[in-house]
Amino acid sequence: MNAFKPLVFSGVQPTGNLHLGNYLGAIRKFVALQEDNDCIYCVVDMHAITAQLVHSDLKAQTRSIAAAFIAAGIDPVKHIVFNQSAVPQHAELAWVFNCVARIGWMERMTQFKDKSGKNAEQVSLGLLAYPSLMAADILVYRATHVPVGDDQKQHLELARDIAQKFNIDFGGHIRNAGLGVNITVGDEPVHAYFPMVEPLIGGPAPRVMSLKDGTKKMSKSDPSDLSRINLMDDVDAISKKIKKAKTDPDALPSEVEGLKGRPEAENLVGIYAALSDKTKADVLAEFGGQQFSTFKPALVELAVNVLAPVNNEMRRLLDDPTHIDAILSQGGERARTIAEKTMNEVRDIIGFLR
């Protein structure tokens, strides 16, 4: 049971060009969630400096993410769209959570291990503490649900651990301050200030793979631009990339089982399924037995029809950066109001003078 008011939070880093995987795996899901939920969507620019401190185009990339949110259909009036650094309460709560969390928790994070590799002593403290800031991003609004991909599930589990430890460590203070609500964690009743945030995982294409290697996730950082379809790609670029996408010589199977061991075929079928809101089985019922020379043009047409309106609206918005800045500023003001209420209560719970 969760007695907290339902609230969805998610964020996207302003690093590299947004691509089809970001759209299908995250942004389109954000749009769908806003229909039945109160939502806060954040451009997490503070996270962007954890692995690379100096960026030449951070402001432009931040505007690009905001433009993509709005172009895809997110309503910045009904919901909140802002950039993380505009709300200093994120950093303040992250410091509290740094003191709640244990170093061992951070060092066990798979993403930290992957990014630090054998050079852990050379990476920033910010990269190690990334999950603590992510927990603060969510919990400074006491959000209850977060749409996440598989690569962020572990970080969300850590956010739950941090929330639970805070609730337990300060349980008496929370009650004495007249704050918190009664929830159930497992079978145990708990008086909690922070919710046990739940992941929202799923959708027809939660993982879109590289167009050049079906075993690797489509990535902003891949050196080959042919490996991904960027949201800012024009019709010619989309067509070229799909036509050059790696495939195998066999025809498409008639059943999903036949895609096993064929990662590139499975990726393209999965992309078609996601863009058309169909299942892979539906796609194979239509194209099974056909060669990629037939399937790829159909995929090009579908991708262009879905992405061109988003692309055009993004370009229109980016032509007027002051408008985007105004949207982010208004969203930041609304976000700060919520976050400051949380931090005032957290300060009281901890015992900070204010």
Swiss-Prot record:
<keyword id="KW-0436">Ligase</keyword>
<keyword id="KW-0067">ATP-binding</keyword>
<dbReference type="GO" id="GO:0005829">
    <property type="term" value="C:cytosol"/>
</dbReference>
<comment type="subunit">
    <text>Homodimer.</text>
</comment>
<feature type="binding site">
    <location>
        <begin position="21"/>
        <end position="22"/>
    </location>
    <ligand>
        <name>ATP</name>
    </ligand>
</feature>
<keyword id="KW-0547">Nucleotide-binding</keyword>
<dbReference type="InterPro" id="IPR050203">
    <property type="entry name" value="Trp-tRNA_synthetase"/>
</dbReference>
<dbReference type="InterPro" id="IPR014729">
    <property type="entry name" value="Rossmann-like_a/b/a_fold"/>
</dbReference>
<feature type="short sequence motif" description="'HIGH' region">
    <location>
        <begin position="14"/>
        <end position="22"/>
    </location>
</feature>
<keyword id="KW-0030">Aminoacyl-tRNA synthetase</keyword>
<dbReference type="InterPro" id="IPR002305">
    <property type="entry name" value="aa-tRNA-synth_Ic"/>
</dbReference>
<dbReference type="GO" id="GO:0006436">
    <property type="term" value="P:tryptophanyl-tRNA aminoacylation"/>
</dbReference>
<feature type="binding site">
    <location>
        <begin position="149"/>
        <end position="151"/>
    </location>
    <ligand>
        <name>ATP</name>
    </ligand>
</feature>
<dbReference type="InterPro" id="IPR002306">
    <property type="entry name" value="Trp-tRNA-ligase"/>
</dbReference>
<comment type="similarity">
    <text>Belongs to the class-I aminoacyl-tRNA synthetase family.</text>
</comment>
<comment type="function">
    <text>Catalyzes the attachment of tryptophan to tRNA(Trp).</text>
</comment>
<feature type="short sequence motif" description="'KMSKS' region">
    <location>
        <begin position="217"/>
        <end position="221"/>
    </location>
</feature>
<feature type="binding site">
    <location>
        <begin position="217"/>
        <end position="221"/>
    </location>
    <ligand>
        <name>ATP</name>
    </ligand>
</feature>
<dbReference type="InterPro" id="IPR001412">
    <property type="entry name" value="aa-tRNA-synth_I_CS"/>
</dbReference>
<keyword id="KW-0648">Protein biosynthesis</keyword>
<dbReference type="GO" id="GO:0005524">
    <property type="term" value="F:ATP binding"/>
</dbReference>
<keyword id="KW-0963">Cytoplasm</keyword>
<feature type="binding site">
    <location>
        <begin position="13"/>
        <end position="15"/>
    </location>
    <ligand>
        <name>ATP</name>
    </ligand>
</feature>
<dbReference type="GO" id="GO:0004830">
    <property type="term" value="F:tryptophan-tRNA ligase activity"/>
</dbReference>
<feature type="binding site">
    <location>
        <position position="208"/>
    </location>
    <ligand>
        <name>ATP</name>
    </ligand>
</feature>
<dbReference type="InterPro" id="IPR024109">
    <property type="entry name" value="Trp-tRNA-ligase_bac-type"/>
</dbReference>
<dbReference type="Pfam" id="PF00579">
    <property type="entry name" value="tRNA-synt_1b"/>
</dbReference>
<feature type="binding site">
    <location>
        <position position="137"/>
    </location>
    <ligand>
        <name>L-tryptophan</name>
    </ligand>
</feature>
<protein>
    <recommendedName>
        <fullName>Tryptophan--tRNA ligase</fullName>
        <ecNumber>6.1.1.2</ecNumber>
    </recommendedName>
</protein>
